[in-house]
Design a protein with these regions (language model features):
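Gly/Ser/Thr-rich phosphate-binding loop
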Residues: 1-22, 27-34, 44-45, 59
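AMP-binding/adenylate-forming catalytic core of the ANL superfamily
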Residues: 4, 57, 61-65, 69-76, ...
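Short coil/loop residues immediately preceding or within conserved phosphate-binding loops
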Residues: 30, 80, 129
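General small-molecule cofactor/ligand-binding pocket signal
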Residues: 180-183
């Protein structure tokens, strides 16, 4: 498996054997890839902080006729030009990187930041789940509530309480979905991307 984008190809990679343990969005950094904090510091292995995945070297000049987006993605930090597409991650003591997700999709629930991809990958480890999408639903108390749209494996049923408990076994309680919606498909495109806007609308229509 590889981590990258059109703005930053070959950022990181992982290898999984048939007998290997399944892990959620974990990679080894490529030689030109670092995890940088918002103020430009390099994140050190074992740090409790999170940062943005950044690639240096042969990176694109920018986006066609979009200087604002180009300036945001392609940044010069301490004299080095970096491509920073917006993926947030943490890094273990052994250097393993755990991808959290895109900052643009981050859900703020009760003042805590939750990255949808992190919860989605964990949900997909449950034996009843084929695929999952996580969005922010309205919540009077927390502002946004973690809402999961889940596609079941053939012959399996989606049980909301089971999936919520499953996530709480792996993560802090605030990252667990408040609601779980069973769907026929999450509509993941061939490139692996999800239409979060459309999925949010589905969640709102279902819950209201």
């Amino acid at each position: 498996d590889a981590l990258g984008s059109s703005e930053a190809i070959g950022m990181a990679q992982s290898t999984t054997s048939a007998a290997g343990e399944s892990k959620t969005a974990s990679f080894e950094l490529g030689p030109n890839t670092k995890i940088l904090t918002e103020d430009g510091r390099e994140l050190q292995p074992g740090s409790s902080e999170i940062g943005r995945v950044a690639l240096k070297g042969n990176t694109p000049i920018g986006y066609y006729k979009d200087p604002e987006k180009s300036a945001k993605t392609f940044q010069i930090i301490n004299g080095v030009r970096w491509s920073i597409p917006g993926d947030w991650a943490s890094i273990d003591v052994d250097g393993t990187v755990h991808l959290l997700g895109r900052g643009s999709q981050c859900i703020n629930t009760g003042g805590e930041k939750v990255y949808p991809e992190e919860v989605e990958e964990a949900l997909k480890l449950h034996p009843s789940v084929a695929d999952a999408a996580v969005v922010g639903g309205p919540d009077e108390r927390f502002g946004q509530a973690i809402t999961a749209l889940v596609e079941a494996l053939p012959g399996q049923n989606i049980v909301e309480a089971d999936l919520i408990a499953f996530i709480k076994q792996h993560y802090a309680a605030y990252k667990a979905p408040k609601r779980v919606i069973a769907v026929a498909t999450v509509g993941r495109a061939s490139n692996g991307k999800l239409d979060y806007k459309a999925l949010t609308e589905i969640a709102l229509a279902t819950l209201t």
